[in-house]
A protein has these predicted regions:
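Conserved alpha-helical substructure of the radical SAM core
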Residues: 17-32, 36, 48-164, 168-178
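Short recognition patches in nucleic-acid-associated and regulatory proteins
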Residues: 5-16
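Terminal RNA-binding accessory module
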Residues: 39-40
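Radical SAM/AdoMet-radical enzyme domain recognition
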Residues: 116-133, 142-252
Length: 253
C-alpha cells in the first residue's frame, strides 16, 4: 500500500494500451499504478525470465519477511547479478542531484582492509560473481585506488566495472593508460548526462563538457570498453536521449 506500506494483493491489467497494477488495501482502499506504457513490450520482456539462482551464502537472517528486511537473507531467490562496492563517500564534485550527498569533505574513504573484506564477502556469496562495480563517491580519488583494483582482479570476478565521473581519466593520461592494464573483462561506467552547460550546472554543479570530451578521447585512444551513464530529469535533459545514443554509437570505445 502506498499509504501504510502494508504488503497487499495486487493484479496486473491491460487498459488503454497500457499496463497497470491494481491494488487494494483493507484500510486505505484501491490504488492504481502505471507499470508500462507499451503492452507488446511488456509481454516480450517476460520471455526473458529465467530460473532463479540462489546465493551460495546468505549474510542476514529473515526477521519480518520481504520487503521489510534489508540484506541478503534466506528469502532471496536470486543471486546478486551486479554488486556495487562503495569504496569512498568522498567525491571531487558536489552534484546537486547526488543521492549519496557526496562531496570533497563528506564522509571518509573505506580502508583497504574494509574493501578487501567486502570483496571477499561477495566471492563467498557468489563463488564467481558476474559483475562487481567499484563505486563511491568518486572511486578514482581513493588513495589506495589501484590496490583495490589489483585485489579485485585477483579474485574470480567475471567482469569488473569502474563507476566514475571521468575527471581523473580526462586530466591524467597516464592514469587512463594504467586502467587499460586491467582489461579484458574491465569496463568504464562513465557519467555522461548532457551536451548543454545549463543542464550540467543543474545536475552536476559544474560545466563538464570539455572534461567529458577529453575523457572519451583518452578512452577511445586506449580502446577501453566504456558505457555512458545518463542521469535523466524530465523536462531538463530527456530531449537529449537520442543525441547521446547517437554520440555513443560513434565512439570506438
Amino acid at each position: 500500500c502506498p499509504e501504510c506500506l502494508r504488503r497487499i494483493d495486487a493484479k496486473i491489467v491491460f487498459e488503454n494500451d497500457k499496463v497497470y497494477m491494481l491494488k487494494r488495501c483493507p484500510e486505505h482502499g484501491k490504488s492504481k499504478v502505471l507499470i508500462a506504457d507499451d503492452i507488446p513490450y511488456y509481454k516480450n520482456i517476460r520471455n526473458y525470465n529465467k530460473p532463479s539462482e540462489t546465493p551460495y551464502k546468505f549474510n542476514t537472517k529473515t526477521d519480518y519477511g520481504c520487503p521489510y528486511d534489508c540484506g541478503l537473507c534466506p528469502d532471496h531467490e536470486q543471486h546478486s547479478c551486479l554488486t556495487v562496492i562503495e569504496v569512498t563517500d568522498r567525491c571531487n564534485l558536489t552534484c546537486p542531484t547526488c543521492y549519496a550527498g557526496s562531496s570533497p569533505t563528506y564522509g571518509r574513504h573505506r580502508t583497504l582492509d574494509e574493501i578487501k573484506t567486502m570483496l571477499d564477502t561477495i566471492v563467498l556469496n557468489e563463488k564467481e560473481p558476474d559483475v562487481v562495480q567499484i563505486s563511491g563517491g568518486e572511486p578514482t580519488i581513493h588513495p589506495d585506488f589501484f590496490a583495490i583494483l589489483d585485489y579485485a582482479k585477483s579474485l574470480p570476478i567475471r567482469h569488473l566495472m569502474l563507476n566514475t565521473n571521468g575527471i581523473k581519466i580526462a586530466k591524467d593520461k597516464e592514469f587512463a593508460k594504467k586502467l587499460k592494464g586491467y582489461a579484458p573483462d574491465f569496463e568504464i561506467y562513465l557519467q555522461f548526462d548532457s551536451f548543454e552547460n545549463s543542464v550540467l550546472q543543474e545536475l552536476r554543479g559544474a560545466d563538464l563538457n570539455e572534461i567529458r570530451k577529453q575523457a572519451i578521447e583518452n578512452l577511445n585512444e586506449l580502446n577501453l570498453s566504456t558505457t555512458l551513464v545518463v542521469t535523466l530529469q524530465k523536462g531538463l535533459n530527456d530531449h537529449e536521449i537520442g543525441k547521446i545514443i547517437e554520440f555513443a554509437l560513434q565512439q570506438k570505445c
